[in-house]
Amino acid sequence: MGHFTFTGLCLLAMFLSLRGAECYTCPIDWLPKNGLCYKVFSNPNTWLDAELFCRKFKPGCRLASLHRDADSADLAEYISDYLKVDGSVWIGLNDPQKKRTWVWSDRSSSNYFSWNQGEPNNSKNKEYCVHLWAPTGYLKWNDAPCESLHPFLCQCKY
């Protein structure tokens, strides 16, 4: 009886530890944050190509959605540490209807915005996508033409 109980407890412990590891293990060089994993990719892409790259990377991946100052600060530090090129970084915020109604590509909702001063300004009536602006240390947002080429930040559910 004692051997059976010991074996059962060992199997239960192994199952629980494997299950926990599977639910929230980010790959190496990804940043774990609030149940998601984030990675900055240095290869410049348009906003749409960056979004499609994230989606193809793994089911449940999109361009990153930012919902709090604390998360933005951690992600800005991560980008500064890992980005291999200079430049602003696409995030998942865009205006697909071109009516100044900003939505996240993962369809999440938020009242949080971190626009740089004077933004969004829709310069030349063609800025419908959003990047983390490099001159602000990746803390503030700027609207930009979606066809511009920038590195990008993916978020994935693991």
Swiss-Prot record:
Keyword entries, A-Z: Calcium, Disulfide bond, Glycoprotein, Hemagglutinin, Lectin, Metal-binding, Secreted, Signal
Keyword Disulfide bond included in the entry's annotation: yes
Cell compartments where the protein resides: Secreted
Residue span of motif Mannose-binding: 119-121
Keyword Zinc-finger tagged: no
Molecular-function annotations in GO: carbohydrate binding; metal ion binding
Family matches, as CDD domains: CLECT_REG-1_like
Disulfide bonds: 26-37, 54-154, 61-156, 129-146
GO CC terms, sorted: extracellular region
Cleavable signal peptide: 1-23
Pfam families xref list: Lectin_C (PF00059)
Family, per entry: Belongs to the true venom lectin family.
Function: Recombinant C-type lectin BML-2 is able to agglutinate erythrocytes. May be a calcium-dependent lectin.
Name assigned to this protein: C-type lectin BML-2
Organism field: Bungarus multicinctus
Organism taxonomic ancestry: Eukaryota, Metazoa, Chordata, Craniata, Vertebrata
